[in-house]
Each structure stands twice: as structure tokens, then as C-alpha cells.
Amino acid sequence: MLPEKESPKLGQTVWAVGAGLGFPPSMTSGEMAFAEQVINGYRYQLATAPIIFGNSGGALFAYSDIRKKYEMVGVPSKVAAANFQVVTHMGWSIPTEAVYIFLRENFHGFIVGDKYLKPENRKSSSEDKKE
């Protein structure tokens, strides 16, 4: 996964992987078009890699020249539409920063390398709000 606090670069080649409409997994390529857009209070990033219904929950990947590996840069989550027509080359994905937050808030930070805490040693989110 893309390191925390990093964002994919505009124009960077990306690949969307998913099992759209129940078919076997497939891969499409495109470019990062928007690094961040807020829609209905949620942050998204836009890529031109075609996605279709069912790709949501798959992954958006990019190659890191620095780390010499492919990294997940987002989670495809919605497709654009205009005049009741799906625009498959406008795929919105959830940024990896939101994935890090979600995993930590749900006590799965160990997936991204955080130290594992036994349930009895964890703070509840209500305790965090008191501090």
C-alpha cells in the first residue's frame, strides 16, 4: 500500500483491478486525474482507468519508481454518470489515507504495520474523545 501521507501523482499511470459484474478479475489502465475531490463530505480521487459496477472494493495500483514495486493507491468505489449514462473512464476511488484511518479505527492497524494491542489494552473511541 502507498505509504501514509503520500498521494499518487497527477498523470501517473494507474491500474484498476476488480471483478466487475461478477466476471473474473480484470485489469484496466489509466491515469490519475484528480488527487482529491470531496463528494457528499467524503474524500475521493479520480482516475481514468475504466471501472464498472462490481469493481468497487477492488484496488487501484501504481508503480513506485522509488520503492520498485506496485502499490495500492486507492479503493475503487464509484463510477461517474452523466445524463443517466455511466462514464466508466471516470472512476472515483477512496484514497489510501482513508484506508489507514479505517483500519486503525476498527482495531486493525496491525495490517499496516502498527503494533498489535490485545483488546484489554486498547482505548475505545469514546476514551479518545475524552482526552
Predicted feature residues:
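Catalytic nucleophile loop of clan PA
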Residues: M32, P50-P76
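Short, Lys/Arg- and Gly-enriched loop/turn segments at beta-strand edges
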Residues: G22-G30
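C-terminal cap/linker of serine protease catalytic domains
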Residues: M72-E131
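Gly/Ser-enriched beta-turn/beta-hairpin loop segments
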Residues: F23, F34-L46, Q85
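Active-site-proximal beta-strand/loop segments in catalytic clefts of secreted hydrolases
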Residues: V17-G20, A49-P50, V75-V79
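Envelope-exposed proteins and targeting segments
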Residues: L10-T13, T28, R43-Q45, S56, ...
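Active-site substrate-binding loop(s) of clan PA
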Residues: M1-F23, F61
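Extracellular/periplasmic catalytic domains that process cell-envelope and extracellular macromolecules
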Residues: E6-K9, F23-P24, V38-N40, F53, ...
